[in-house]
């Protein structure tokens, strides 16, 4: 016990010397992470032998010390690789070589020169998100070499170039679907404002300017067919054709809007597609009309045979009915009941899904009846993150989202089968009355960056 405390105090003194020296060389940062690794190994050994406190320092659980030791080992290997590169002699501080800085986007890369930018969603000055971009990014290649590149920002996000590949590490379109409603945003970089790319809505006439319009699809990509190559990211998911986002017009008009030579073949293809769509819709209309004529023919034939059957009976009564006639009458009777709405409905309507808040009892004798009852299970949302972050988020949301969330759980964690040590991050469950409430909550929620979420449901709350 005394030996462990003495070694632990020695490691603490070494860390204090490193913090007070303020050296900015890479070797000092490697020594810092080596000392942290030894400290976590010592704490792990103490907890494994039943020691709960070293001096005034409580010993953390085994899973915590093990994970921190692995993080320290990974940082040492990463810094040693950077030290062997051409950038090993540059000044490096504790903040630049911290685990949080390395794991921030772009992950597992070193960054210098932070800069804060703001993105305004939906043109609302109150709906503003702040992002941190970097002027210089050091990334590791597959050959264990390091490259230093400059960071950039445009309307779609923050990016850097890996050779000739444009790599985005912040995407504004993902946050626009979470925080916004219209899918339009503005990027404020220092005193400059980056708007949506200008898209042409009509060809230029004469020497006058062309009419332009800011349009944006729900995915965050500009809906344009003519954009400069420098303003469109290289990712295929960020480009979309203009004709899929606007109302269909006549093929002749489309062909006139295309440039001569280049757009002519494209206009012919659109004209062919337009004719195919008209033929398919016309065929469906003919089929529906034919079905109506067949149904009318069956009903008229049934009406015509009724007087004949009555004349065959005695005393004006109904004559003998054949098996085919009884089947047709039962089918027509069921159709009339379904059309009139008097037949009993079997199943669970969309409005009833998620309305049950109690477990299904034993009174359901049959698999179908039980499945229909279980279809009303209440929907849930599971949040994963730091315990304090989840508690603060719950405190804020209980004031803002009144009427959407039925219950908030306390923070909890999983434990292993063989021990009571906590596994992974903390959890918190949100329960809703209906799936519509949960979907509305998802559209308006603003989760912290370190919190993940998933969906599910249970049979009882």
Swiss-Prot record:
Residues 217-239 have a biased composition (Polar residues). GO terms for cellular component: host cell nucleus. Residues 1-201 are annotated as: Transactivation domain. Residues 339-349 have a biased composition (Low complexity). Residues 377-461 are annotated as: DNA-binding domain. Phosphorylated. Gene3D superfamilies: 3.30.70.330, E2 (early) protein, N terminal domain, subdomain 1, Papillomavirus E2 early protein domain. Residues 197-364 are annotated as: Disordered. Residues 326-338 have a biased composition (Basic residues). Signal peptide: none annotated. Coiled coil: none annotated. It comes from the Viruses. Pfam families: PPV_E2_C, PPV_E2_N. GO terms for molecular function: DNA binding; DNA-binding transcription factor activity; nucleotide binding. One of its GO terms (biological process) is DNA replication. It is found in: Host nucleus. Keywords: Activator, DNA replication, DNA-binding, Early protein, Host nucleus, Phosphoprotein, Repressor, Transcription, Transcription regulation. Belongs to the papillomaviridae E2 protein family. Plays a role in the initiation of viral DNA replication. A dimer of E2 interacts with a dimer of E1 in order to improve specificity of E1 DNA binding activity. Once the complex recognizes and binds DNA at specific sites, the E2 dimer is removed from DNA. E2 also regulates viral transcription through binding to the E2RE response element (5'-ACCNNNNNNGGT-3') present in multiple copies in the regulatory regions of the viral genome. Activates or represses transcription depending on E2RE's position with regards to proximal promoter elements including the TATA-box. Binds DNA as homodimer. Interacts with protein E1; this interaction greatly increases E1 DNA-binding activity. Interacts with protein L1; this interaction enhances E2-dependent replication and transcription activation. Interacts with protein L2; this interaction inhibits E2 transcriptional activity but not DNA replication function E2. Interacts with protein E7; this interaction inhibits E7 oncogenic activity. Interacts with host TAF1; this interaction modulates E2-dependent transcriptional regulation. Interacts with host BRD4; this interaction mediates E2 transcriptional activation function. This is Regulatory protein E2.
